[in-house]
Swiss-Prot record:
Compositionally skewed regions (Low complexity) per UniProt: 848-892, 900-914
Recorded GO MF terms: penicillin binding; peptidoglycan glycosyltransferase activity; serine-type D-Ala-D-Ala carboxypeptidase activity
Name of this chain's protein: Penicillin-binding protein 1A/1B
Active-site residues from the entry: E115, S390
Biological source species: Bacillus subtilis (strain 168)
Pathway where it operates: Cell wall biogenesis; peptidoglycan biosynthesis
Record region (Transpeptidase): 329-662
Region of interest: Disordered: 1-29, 773-914
Chief site of localization: membrane
Function description: Cell wall formation. Synthesis of cross-linked peptidoglycan from the lipid intermediates. The enzyme has a penicillin-insensitive transglycosylase N-terminal domain (formation of linear glycan strands) and a penicillin-sensitive transpeptidase C-terminal domain (cross-linking of the peptide subunits). Required for vegetative growth. Has a partially redundant function with PBP-2A (pbpA) during spore outgrowth.
Disulfide bonds: none
PANTHER family the record matches: BINDING PROTEIN TRANSPEPTIDASE, PUTATIVE-RELATED (PTHR32282), PENICILLIN-BINDING PROTEIN 1A (PTHR32282:SF29)
């Protein structure tokens, strides 16, 4: 057995040597790789920790120290105008510092439940809160929830800038931990509650309680009041309980639910507090809130603080901010003078709102918040939501159709009886129809039907997209066809700020800049934050230029003439809105009374939107009279005259071509060589769309000029005491013969196709004057002559001699007649030339009359609204004397008749009727 065992053992060893096991080899290899990987990771971890520690140390090495004066005594912030001049200081004088012992538990708990539920558990930073914020941001988007603790907020607002950098965040974490080590929780909470921003006039819980509830003893604050205040820091403007009670109440109820969740209040307390409306929980009245202020730029400053709050993550309560704004104090002073003075025609109860922008960059230079408006009151420049009237037409109708359909300024639109798509008729204030008119004329005269047709041509969706690109923020589902003429429904409306921003893009080659009040912020550590919005292209340059050129016409000869400024290139549009039938009866609105009156206009330098309407007044007046509707245009004109030096112009881009077209041609045709000057129009076309066909309308007139009545001759028959009148005419015509005897009036004696007329029973010694007019399909031709009948003689020889002389004289006169006609034709100085000239002058004067609207009738009372919820329509701001349009006209000319005292003088003229 032993030998056998040895033999097997020997064989096993031999096999082992000759065939190594592959499995054992792999196991040894895996073990080595694992050890190497583990060792490598360990090395990297150590290096990472060391590197992180070094990096952390470097980042916090220059972190500011915990300066107790900055932590407990907030510094004020300074606001500067566009030139860097200080205009206001905010913060320090708006605080009432209270100690933690003066702050009741209900207030502390309301803020802790809302801002930092684990405040008493963490050591400056809260990993649980940070994790929750990360999840919320992942689910709902970046910024959905913040991860900062109350401690971090104190550090950030007292010691650091708001730059979104890793270094700043690391320093914030480090300083928060240090703050927790050096100060108690109550001390940190006291710092926080005394620096929170509630409004430009209220920093800290002490001032806020007084500002919104009239409470100076914080122990008297109720649960619902504490919850309302705790809900405000997230968005102080939106959750202001005086200005926005509904939003404030929704936010307060969220805070109450958080307080209940954290066990700070019971279910019964929660239910009781939730039932109390914000307006019933002791909020001060609007009048109490509208306190006087020593700063004359307070309305502008409020918008500055509001913009910082809404458009950045900068806390306005942060210490030592330097806020650089867009304010032009000179313009603001002038606007205040206009709004509160009596130079523009304001009447008792009238209100107004104005926004003045820089056309090129959207910077707000001045605002008219209202007439004698108290600080903190309603801001008519930024908060108004009024129907825009006809000022919407460039934005929602003509701008989109030029951009997408490339309509020219000459595009012919039929202003005839028309209805909305739902069958409801649409009308203009004058209840008239002008027939085919150009887009330029339609916009300048503010006609409604062409505007609706332009809107329909481009389509609602495209039109709304265009308008929203200019900042209007319309919802497509809400927009009806009535919007095309300014009949907004529901809660839709526009402010002067919105309209100024939209119109400025037309004056800026199609580039839109969102209106803004703040340029930049400098923090107490010297870092800066640029808040200038990015520019965006809202339309093609050809759209911007063509709208601008048409709006220049609206100011020169249309409804906006009162807004003209000498020496300044102005483009702009009027707009008025009216009342529905029920409101007219309810408020006893006078005929022509308007709800709103607008003027929105711009120059190469400035854009201004002006709204006027009736505010609260003791008389209860609701509407603007025709005279009061002029105020908006006067404000614009006087403001621009003061701030604009007239430099700059609206330059035609290469994408636009100019063409002289024949008035009334449709489609457009170029004016021909014979087109009368008063039938020529210079219009603009998108490059590649201009007409190439030359009109031939007036060519036939030149060719048929020779078809004149000529050779008018008179022969006397002594025996029959008659005169025979004859003439030449090449073609078919009807001839009207008129006669005058001895200077009397003309009377028609014959009207036929015959080319002669016999006048019997003539009286010797009398002078007969004749006028013959040929009337044909090609026009009219008139000639005239006169003849003196010889007196009777007793001497037969003398009679014979006289007869011979008369016959000779007749022959000479016949020759003279022919010479006279020829010379008149050669000289080209016929009576007809004079007649045409005078008629053209008269036509031009009539054209001027027809395109020069009266400012007394600048409203468009169109009671047609496609929206059942709103019957308010735009007025077309037209003129009852506007008459017919710019695209049709009559060429029929009246004749002058030249008669003389010669025995016989012929003259001829021609008049063509098309």
């Amino acid at each position: 057995m032993s030998d056998q065992f040895n033999s097997r053992e020997a064989r096993r060893k031999a096999n082992s040597k000759s065939s190594p096991s592959p499995k054992k080899g792999k196991k040894r290899k895996k073990g080595g790789l694992f050890k190497k990987t583990l060792f490598t990771l360990l090395i990297l971890f150590v290096l990472g920790v060391v590197g992180g520690a070094v990096t952390f140390a470097v980042m916090v090495s220059d972190a500011p120290s915990l300066d107790e004066s900055k932590l407990k005594t907030p510094y004020s912030s300074t606001i500067y105008d566009k030139n860097g001049k200080e205009i206001a200081e905010v913060g320090a004088e708006k605080r009432t510092y209270v100690s933690i012992d003066e702050i009741p538990d209900v207030v502390k708990e309301a803020f802790i439940a809302t801002e930092d539920a684990r405040f008493y558990e963490h050591h400056g930073i809260d990993p649980v809160r940070i994790g929750g914020a990360l999840v919320a941001n992942f689910k709902d988007g970046f910024g959905a929830e913040g991860g900062s603790t109350i401690t971090q907020q104190v550090v950030k607002n007292s010691l650091l800038s708001h730059q979104k950098t890793l270094k700043r965040k690391v320093q914030e974490v480090w300083l928060s931990i240090q703050l927790e080590r050096n100060y108690s929780k109550d001390e940190i909470l006291e710092m926080y509650l005394n620096r929170i921003y509630f409004s430009p006039r209220a920093y800290g819980i002490g001032k806020a309680a007084e500002e919104f509830f009239g409470v100076t003893d914080l122990s008297k604050l109720t649960v619902e009041q504490a919850a309302t205040l705790a809900g405000m820091p997230q968005s102080p403007t939106a959750y202001n309980p005086v200005k926005n009670p509904d939003k404030a109440e929704k936010r307060r109820n969220i805070v109450l639910s958080l307080m209940k969740k954290q066990g700070f209040i019971s279910d019964s307390q929660y239910n009781k507090a939730k039932k109390v409306a914000v307006k019933d929980e002791g909020v001060v009245s609007q009048k109490e809130y509208e306190k006087a202020s020593t700063n004359k730029y307070s309305a502008f400053v409020e918008e500055v603080m509001k913009e910082i709050d809404e458009k950045s993550d900068v806390d306005p309560s942060a210490d030592g901010l330097k806020i650089y704004t867009t304010l032009d104090t000179k313009a603001q002073d002038k606007l205040d003078e206009l709004m509160d003075g009596d130079t523009v025609g304001f009447t008792e109860g009238m209100q107004g709102g104005v926004t003045l922008l820089d056309t090129k960059n959207g910077e707000v230079r001045a605002i008219g918040a209202g007439r004698n408006q108290p600080v903190g009151g309603f801001n008519y420049a930024t908060q108004t939501k009024a129907q825009p009237g006809s000022t919407i037409k460039p934005i929602l109708d003509y701008g989109p159709v030029i951009e997408n359909k490339k309509w020219s300024t000459y595009e012919q639109i039929d202003d005839s009886a028309y209805t909305y798509s739902n069958g409801k008729p649409i009308r203009d204030w004058d209840r008239k129809y002008l027939g085919p008119i150009s887009m330029r004329y339609a916009l300048a005269q503010s006609r409604n039907i062409p505007a609706l047709k332009a809107f329909q041509a481009v389509g609602k969706d495209t039109a709304v997209d265009f308008a929203n690109g200019l900042g209007l923020g319309l919802t497509k589902d809400n927009v009806t066809e009535a919007y095309s003429i300014g009949g907004f429904g529901g809660n839709d409306g526009v402010s002067p700020l919105t309209m100024a921003g939209a119109y400025s893009a037309f004056g800026n080659n199609g580039t839109y800049n969102e209106p803004h009040f703040v340029k930049s912020i400098e923090f107490n550590d010297g870092t800066k934050l640029d808040l200038t919005p990015k520019s965006k292209s809202a339309m093609s340059d050809y759209t911007a230029f063509m709208i601008t050129d048409m709006l220049k016409t609206a100011v020169k000869t249309g409804t906006g003439q009162l807004a003209q400024v000498p020496g300044v290139e102005v483009a702009g549009k009027t707009g008025t809105t009216n009342f529905d039938d029920n409101e007219v009866k309810r408020y006893n609105i006078a005929s022509g009374g308007a709800r709103d009156s607008w003027f929105v206009g711009y120059t190469p330098q400035y854009t201004a939107a002006v709204w006027t309407g009736m505010g609260e007044n003791e008389a209860g007046k609701k509407s603007l009279s025709a005279e009061e509707q002029k105020v908006a245009k006067r404000i614009f004109a006087q403001l621009i005259a003061d701030v604009d030096d007239g430099s700059g112009s609206f330059e035609k881009p290469d994408s636009v071509v100019e063409a002289t077209v024949e008035k009334g041609s449709n489609p457009a045709k170029l004016a021909g060589p014979n087109t009368p000057s008063d039938k020529k129009l210079t219009e603009y076309f998108v490059k590649g769309t201009a007409p190439s066909t030359v009109s031939k309308t007036y060519e036939k007139e030149e060719k048929e000029e020779t078809a004149k009545l000529s050779g008018l001759n008179v022969k006397y028959d002594k025996d029959n005491q008659s005169l025979t009148l004859s003439w030449n005419y090449d073609g078919d015509a009807t001839f009207a013969v008129k006669q005058s005897v001895d200077g009397g009036s003309y009377s028609e004696i014959q009207n036929s196709s015959a080319k002669e007329a016999v006048i019997s029973g003539v009286q010797p010694g009398s002078v007969y004057k004749f006028e013959v007019t040929a009337v044909s399909d090609d026009g009219k031709s008139t000639a005239s002559t006169s003849y003196e009948v010889p007196k009777a003689e007793d001497d037969e020889d003398k009679k014979d001699q006289q007869q011979t002389d008369d016959e000779k004289q007749d022959d000479e006169k016949t020759q003279d007649d022919t010479q006279t006609d020829d010379s008149q034709k050669d000289d080209g100085q016929t009576d007809q030339d004079q007649t045409d000239d005078s008629t053209n002058d008269q036509d031009k004067k009539q054209d001027n009359t027809n395109t020069n609207p009266s400012d007394n009738n600048n409203q468009d009372q169109s009671n047609d609204n496609d929206n059942d919820n709103s019957n308010n329509q735009d007025t077309s701001d037209g003129d009852s004397n506007s008459g017919k349009n710019d695209s049709t006209g009559s060429d029929t000319n009246k004749n002058k008749t030249d008669t003389s005292n010669k025995t016989q003088t012929n003259s001829s003229s021609i008049e063509k009727t098309n």
